[in-house]
Each structure stands twice: as structure tokens, then as C-alpha cells.
């Protein structure tokens, strides 16, 4: 950021304005014996061209998806982002993450959020969406807290394979709220066991949680899981990848009471892991328990359409002790990105992105499975992500593939498991997929 230092006369003017004669007068509260008397040992000052050259040199050590072909996933995906998204979101009237405190003054911001809510409801086939949460993990944690509040029960069952980081955030939220009962269902072939789930869900369970697709990219039996939840009076909470809904059934169609998701695939860059977008939707009967902000449409005194923050008595700035959540802000800029992305692509465009991602992922999976020493770890159907068992440690595969300017995937050893988690998006070309396979064959020496 450009910075011009204050002149001596400007400093004197500021000191005079606050009633002191020197900077030392501001330090009277600090004992003499602990004050630093010498000059700081700093390197010599540089001019702007030198600083720019230094920082650009440091930044060049970072390699992004603009430099390497990426097969990384695990919650952050390298989907194409239309240039129009950055152009629109960079407009000064949008360039803030905050809903204004006098919200109704900013009708444009409220309308943008309202459009986002409407699009998300259509995508998830749910009745109500809030203005957004911090990210997919916090949205899931807030969903479970909401389920406990609604049902008066204290346990949650995770039906399948949840993202480990989402699971960690969930446990942190629940422990802070005095709950410690997160029960993990048994996994079979990378998805939750329906028979085992039936034994776990009972009268004390507030919510049955499932991620679709799950962390491994596999597809859970969501209809069976939802039926078990409802048979036992629990709420059915689904964390669904929004981009997958261009191809897979929407949570509302198979009975989700609360549906959340990580909105990063909808026009938000990977950006070292954030900021991202927490999608949060519910059925109509739960609207007064939903956390976060809600934008509604109304009529002003002249009969014109207008937008307001509605049902604010749920929020902590109105009734702190009875608030549904302590979240009082939202990811408005990221929500705007998602709204623009969905509007630009439309229904058919989203279907094409999802279908291409799935088709290319299955093409690559088949090619990799044919390489001696490599195999798919699970047999369950998957969307655009799958786990590969490798003949050498996954970390070694990743390291060697970097030499070919390839991000090979996510090493599951980070989570105490074996395998390489590989993700494929619509951006990948057939030439890139074939090159990935060729390089895999070459690095293992089998």
C-alpha cells in the first residue's frame, strides 16, 4: 500500500491537538527502565522499485493453479471463474463483506443478498436461505446447534465420511456449547453403513449429518439416511457441494430439514483456503430458528418494492440471551460472487460444469486404475473426486509430480489414512488428463 510519512510540522500539529508537546509525553505510563533507548536495528531503507522487486521475487516462489495443473480438492476446487465476476464484485458499492448497520439505506446490497438467497433456495430445493455464513464448516456446526435447539436433544450422528476439518470445527462448536456426543457411523467401502446407522440413531439424537459427496468424493445413500433420521424424530442435516447439484439430486428433494454447503466452487478462488462462503438453507417450519441474517422483500409506504433485514429478533444484537446464534455478520461479497456465477451459467451451464467434471474424473480414474501398482481405494460411485492407492507413499507421488508442474492431489496421510485424493474439474483437458497418467507411470518405476 502506498504510504507517505508525516512531516515534522504535521506531527507537531497532531501532538498539539491532543495537548502534549512531544512524542515522549505519550510514553509517560511506560517506566523508563523498560523503554528502548537505542534505534531499531533495521536494514537500510529502500525505494519503491527496490521494494517491489524484492516482494515480487519472494512471491514468485509461490506456485498457483495459474502455473501448475491442479488435481487438488478436499474442499477447495479449481473451477473456471468467469472474468465478469471480478469485474462486478470489484465495483466500490459492492466491495465490502458487511451488511450495513442501517441496512435499509443500502437497497442495492440488500437486493444482491436477496437474489443470492433466492438462487440458493432453487439450487438446494429448500424454502429459506440466510444471507450466508463464514464457510461450509461453520455452516455445518451452526446447523447441528440449531437441530439441538429445535429438538431439545444432545447427540449428533455423522452418517458417512465428513471432511476432517469440518468434523473438527463441529466438535469445537459443540464442546464450547457443553455437548460432547458426536457419534461416527461405521464406514464400508468409503461410505456410511446403513445397517450400522440404524443401531446408532435413537431417541436422544438431535441430528443425523451427512456430507454429499463425502470427503472421499463418494456418494452416500442419502435417501436411506434421511429415512432413518426421520423415523427417530431427528433432523436430517445435509452438507451438499453446491456445484454437484447441477447433476445430483438436491437436498430438499430427499427430505433434508437443514441443508448447508461450502460455496467456494461457485465463483470464489481457492485463495489459500479463504475467505469462503457458508451456504445455509432450511425448510419453512424452521425459519425462526435459522442463524445469521435474512433479507426479505416488502412494500414501502408508497407501494414500491423494497428490501429489509427481517425476523431480526432471532439475532444476538436484539436478544443476546435468546439468540439463535452469535453470528451477526455474513460473507456478502462471496455470496455476491456465487449469485453472479449462478446467474451467468444458468441451469444448463451449471449442469454442463457438473457433468464435465464428473465425466473427466471417471475417465482419469479408469486410466489410473489401469496403471500397475495403482488402484481405486473404494468401489462406491463418486462425483468429481476419488481416492487412489499408490505403490509408493502419496507424499512421494506429490513431490515427484511437482517436477512436472502438477499438483497431484491431497495426501490422506495428513488425516492418518492411506491414499491420494484426486479431484478433477471441468477445466482439465484430455491432454492434461493423459499427461497426468503418463507422468504417474514414469515416476513410480514399475
UniProtKB/Swiss-Prot annotation:
Annotated catalysed reactions: N(6)-[(R)-lipoyl]-L-lysyl-[glycine-cleavage complex H protein] + glycine + H(+) = N(6)-[(R)-S(8)-aminomethyldihydrolipoyl]-L-lysyl-[glycine-cleavage complex H protein] + CO2
Keyword rRNA-binding: no
GO terms (BP aspect): glycine decarboxylation via glycine cleavage system; nucleoside metabolic process
GO MF term (any one): glycine dehydrogenase (decarboxylating) activity
SUPFAM superfamilies to which the protein is assigned, alphabetical: PLP-dependent transferases (SSF53383)
Enzyme Commission identifier(s): 1.4.4.2
Keywords recorded for this protein, A-Z: Oxidoreductase
InterPro entries per record: GcvPA, GDC-P_N, GDC_P, PyrdxlP-dep_Trfase, PyrdxlP-dep_Trfase_major, PyrdxlP-dep_Trfase_small
Complex and partners: The glycine cleavage system is composed of four proteins: P, T, L and H. In this organism, the P 'protein' is a heterodimer of two subunits.
Family listed: Belongs to the GcvP family. N-terminal subunit subfamily.
Function: The glycine cleavage system catalyzes the degradation of glycine. The P protein binds the alpha-amino group of glycine through its pyridoxal phosphate cofactor; CO(2) is released and the remaining methylamine moiety is then transferred to the lipoamide cofactor of the H protein.
Identification of the protein by name: Probable glycine dehydrogenase (decarboxylating) subunit 1
Origin organism lineage: Bacteria, Pseudomonadati, Chlorobiota, Chlorobiia, Chlorobiales
Gene name of the encoded protein: gcvPA
Amino acid at each position: 500500500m502506498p504510504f507517505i510519512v508525516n512531516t515534522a510540522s504535521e506531527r507537531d500539529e497532531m501532538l498539539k491537538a491532543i495537548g502534549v508537546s512531544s512524542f515522549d509525553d505519550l510514553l509517560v505510563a511506560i517506566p523508563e527502565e523498560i523503554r528502548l533507548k537505542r534505534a531499531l536495528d533495521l536494514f537500510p531503507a529502500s525505494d519503491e522499485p527496490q521494494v517491489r522487486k524484492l516482494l515480487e521475487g519472494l512471491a514468485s516462489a509461490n506456485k498457483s493453479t495459474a502455473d501448475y495443473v491442479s488435481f487438488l480438492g478436499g474442499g477447495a476446487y479449481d473451477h473456471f471463474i468467469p472474468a465478469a465476476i471480478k469485474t462486478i464484485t470489484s465495483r466500490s458499492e459492492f466491495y465490502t463483506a458487511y451488511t450495513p448497520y442501517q441496512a435499509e439505506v443500502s437497497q442495492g446490497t440488500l437486493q444482491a443478498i436477496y437474489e443470492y438467497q433466492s438462487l440458493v433456495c432453487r439450487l438446494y430445493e429448500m424454502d429459506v436461505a440466510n444471507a450466508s455464513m463464514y464457510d461450509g464448516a461453520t455452516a455445518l456446526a451452526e446447523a447441528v446447534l440449531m437441530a439441538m435447539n429445535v429438538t431439545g436433544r444432545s447427540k449428533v450422528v455423522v452418517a458417512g465420511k465428513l471432511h476432517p476439518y469440518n468434523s473438527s470445527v463441529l466438535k469445537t462448536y459443540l464442546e464450547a456449547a457443553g455437548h460432547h456426543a458426536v457419534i461416527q457411523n461405521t464406514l464400508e467401502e468409503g461410505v456410511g453403513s446403513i445397517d450400522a446407522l440404524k443401531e446408532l440413531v435413537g431417541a436422544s439424537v438431535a441430528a443425523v449429518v451427512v456430507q454429499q459427496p463425502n470427503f472421499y468424493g463418494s456418494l452416500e445413500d442419502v435417501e436411506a439416511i434421511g429415512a432413518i433420521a426421520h423415523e427417530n424424530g431427528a433432523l436430517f442435516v445435509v452438507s451438499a457441494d453446491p456445484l454437484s447439484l447441477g447433476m445430483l439430486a438436491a437436498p430438499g428433494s430427499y427430505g433434508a430439514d437443514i441443508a448447508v454447503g461450502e460455496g467456494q466452487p461457485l465463483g470464489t478462488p481457492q485463495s489459500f483456503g479463504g475467505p469462503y462462503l457458508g451456504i445455509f438453507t432450511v425448510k419453512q417450519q424452521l425459519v425462526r430458528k435459522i442463524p445469521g441474517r435474512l433479507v426479505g422483500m416488502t412494500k414501502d409506504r408508497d407501494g414500491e418494492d423494497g428490501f429489509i433485514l427481517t425476523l431480526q429478533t432471532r439475532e444476538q444484537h436484539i436478544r443476546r440471551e435468546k439468540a439463535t446464534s452469535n453470528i451477526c455478520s455474513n460473507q456478502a461479497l462471496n455470496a455476491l460472487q456465487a449469485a453472479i456465477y449462478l446467474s451467468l451459467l444458468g441451469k444448463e451451464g451449471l449442469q454442463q460444469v457438473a457433468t464435465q467434471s464428473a465425466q473427466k474424473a471417471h475417465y482419469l480414474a479408469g486410466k489410473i486404475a489401469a496403471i500397475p501398482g495403482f488402484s481405486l481405494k473404494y468401489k462406491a460411485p463418486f462425483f468429481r473426486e476419488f481416492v487412489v492407492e499408490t505403490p509408493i507413499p502419496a507424499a512421494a507421488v506429490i513431490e515427484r509430480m511437482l517436477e512436472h508442474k502438477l499438483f497431484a492431489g491431497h495426501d490422506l496421510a495428513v488425516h492418518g489414512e492411506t491414499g491420494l485424493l484426486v479431484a478433477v474439474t471441468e477445466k482439465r483437458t484430455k491432454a492434461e488428463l493423459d499427461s497426468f497418467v503418463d507422468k504417474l507411470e514414469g515416476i513410480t518405476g514399475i
